[in-house]
Amino acid sequence: MSQFENVTIIKKANVYYDGKVTSRSILFQDGSKKTLGILMPGQYDFGTDEKEIMEILDGELLVKLPGQEVWSEIKGGQSFEVPAKSRFQMDVKKISDYCCSYIQNS
């Protein structure tokens, strides 16, 4: 899906790692939430409250998911899932455009 209809967008940005990771929150009528953002090259560690699906729209990164010993390469057009209540690491190689979906009650 390349666009969203009938949504509420929170104007204030979510800013992490001194501005190297930024996003905007999108709220849907059914109560679901997504963020659209940009990852600058660098290494990042994030925790999750809910299950997350990270769709990389453009760019290139490595991700290490919970329980994995090796890094997986992710490029534009690919996605990965992160379990709720866990941590994951990203090593962003090229500026990456992403959409993160938060999956409730997982």
UniProtKB/Swiss-Prot annotation:
Catalyzes the phosphorolysis of diverse nucleosides, yielding D-ribose 1-phosphate and the respective free bases. Can use uridine, adenosine, guanosine, cytidine, thymidine, inosine and xanthosine as substrates. Also catalyzes the reverse reactions. HAMAP family: Nucleos_phosphorylase_PpnP. It comes from the Bacteria. This is Pyrimidine/purine nucleoside phosphorylase. InterPro entries: Ppnp, RmlC-like_jellyroll, RmlC_Cupin_sf. It catalyses: a purine D-ribonucleoside + phosphate = a purine nucleobase + alpha-D-ribose 1-phosphate; adenosine + phosphate = alpha-D-ribose 1-phosphate + adenine; cytidine + phosphate = cytosine + alpha-D-ribose 1-phosphate; guanosine + phosphate = alpha-D-ribose 1-phosphate + guanine. It holds the Pfam family Ppnp. The lineage of its organism: Bacteria, Pseudomonadati, Spirochaetota, Spirochaetia, Leptospirales. PANTHER family: PYRIMIDINE/PURINE NUCLEOSIDE PHOSPHORYLASE (PTHR36540), PYRIMIDINE_PURINE NUCLEOSIDE PHOSPHORYLASE (PTHR36540:SF1). GO terms for cellular component: cytosol. Its EC number is 2.4.2.1, 2.4.2.2. Keywords: Glycosyltransferase, Transferase. Belongs to the nucleoside phosphorylase PpnP family. GO terms for molecular function: guanosine phosphorylase activity; purine-nucleoside phosphorylase activity; pyrimidine-nucleoside phosphorylase activity; thymidine phosphorylase activity; uridine phosphorylase activity.
